[in-house]
């Protein structure tokens, strides 16, 4: 009468069987124990490997059986399916690589569902956090520059008033006296003499034709704060120049 294990082996020779798990040596890499999906075991003969250290130890482990024992039905971990398990020897104890659970240590909590990946989202990993400011509008930039320029002009006028406050009116510059006195006199009287110049109205000074009284050079860059240092070379500090019609 034939052995039932031989019959099972003959039936399975024609069709490859799926391996449930295998135990191999971490030193030589040879397969020490192999269990198929149908519960059959394929174990290396002891005579071929006389120094095998797993023969006696694995027979005493719970949940792992020898060649003569029939496996009992139990829940098996899906983690052990089609995975390679490495056994390491530490003295007289045998451990599994990577802290993998034993065959009878399976719990329901061991099989956790994979996290759901949210598609359509962009995740940025960074090691520094900085405040990203919105770019300044061109109008706001020009307005800021003009505001600074007005403040600078007000400060310069205040300094001039303070410096001229203790002086007499006759000590003021000649150009300023010519630009203020005759024009104010004519405007107060309301009449302009017929022989006066229509360009300067008899004051002898007119607004600069290059800068139009802004006192800034045409070569100045309006988008930089350094343009205040570039003055118009054709007029004085008040933005006036001698009348060209009167000087002819």
From Swiss-Prot:
Disordered: region residues: 1-20, 150-172
Q: Does the keyword Zinc-finger apply?
A: no
Q: Where can this protein be found?
A: Cell projection, Stereocilium
Name the residue ranges with Basic and acidic residues bias: 1-16, 157-172
Q: Which GO terms describe its cellular component?
A: microvillus; stereocilium base; stereocilium shaft
Q: Which UniProt keywords apply?
A: Cell projection, Deafness, Hearing, Non-syndromic deafness
The record's annotation in InterPro entries points to:
GRXCR2 (IPR033023), HSP_DnaJ_Cys-rich_dom_sf (IPR036410)
Determine if Cytoplasm is one of this entry's keywords.
no
Which Gene Ontology BP terms does the record give?
A: auditory receptor cell stereocilium organization; protein localization to organelle; sensory perception of sound
Q: From the UniProt record, list the coiled-coil ranges.
A: none
Q: Which Pfam families match?
A: GRXCR1-2_C (PF23733)
The subunit field of the Swiss-Prot or TrEMBL record says:
Interacts with TPRN; the interaction restricts TPRN to the stereocilum basal region.
Disorder cited: Deafness, autosomal recessive, 101: A form of non-syndromic deafness characterized by bilateral, moderate to severe hearing loss. Vestibular function is unaffected.
Q: Which family does it belong to?
A: Belongs to the GRXCR2 family.
Q: What does this protein do?
A: Required for hearing. Plays a role in maintaining cochlear stereocilia bundles that are involved in sound detection. Ensures the restriction of TPRN to the basal region of stereocilia in hair cells.
Q: What is this protein called?
A: Glutaredoxin domain-containing cysteine-rich protein 2
Q: What is the lineage of its organism?
A: Eukaryota, Metazoa, Chordata, Craniata, Vertebrata
